[in-house]
Amino acid sequence: MAPGAGLYVFKVLDYLGMGQTSDSIRALKYIKENCVRLNIKILNFSVGYLPCSDTAERIKILKLIDELWDMGVVVVAAAGNYGPAPFSVTVPGISRKIITVGSFDDIRSGKGPTDCCIVKPEILAPGHDIISLGTRDGTYVRKTGTSMATPIVSGAIALLLEKNPNMRPEAVKLALYNTCD
């Protein structure tokens, strides 16, 4: 989608898609310490944690995500797949600041409002039967969920920043709002 974009990949999940919040915290701290040097403009966070467990670690994730946003990194997070009930958006998608992505073609897509009455997700993208890499043998597989929808929005943002490299995250979010139907 954005062939001129460079990528840094941070592994926070195992081959089964399972992970610890501590792995995400470690990756987020590294990104925070190195985002200027590495010229990281967008953080695609296709991982979600339920807000009700490991509260202290989830608060750390939210704090780091918000700090990255304040430093000028556009943070795009998956809404999670615990919907369609209200209050089902996962951490870090519940952050007031960041852009949270749901899947318009998956009924399990996380849905707001958050417990702080924030309307989430802000944007929807395709997330059903998306062709992706397999984890075991490098073949392609079909995957479904908000983790598949989130990179589509991140790619669109990369194109926007290619033309407007000095846009702040707030302006990027507003541009998305103003162009969505």
Listing of model-derived features with the role each one plays in the protein:
Residues 40-133, 177-180:
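Catalytic-core segments of hydrolase enzymes
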Residues 8-14, 43, 127-181:
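Hydrolase catalytic cores
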Residues 21, 25-28, 62, 86-89, ...:
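Extracytoplasmic/secreted envelope proteins and their assembly/folding machinery
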Residues 4, 46, 80, 145-147:
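Residue-level detector of functionally special positions within alpha-helical transmembrane segments
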Residues 15-20, 51-55, 142-143:
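A generic structural signal for short coil/turn motifs at secondary-structure boundaries
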Residues 28-38:
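Short, well-structured alpha-helical segments in soluble
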Residues 1-22, 36-41, 94-97, 113-120, ...:
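Subtilisin-like serine protease catalytic core
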Residues 20, 57, 94, 146-149:
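Short, conserved glycine- and acidic-residue-centered signature motifs
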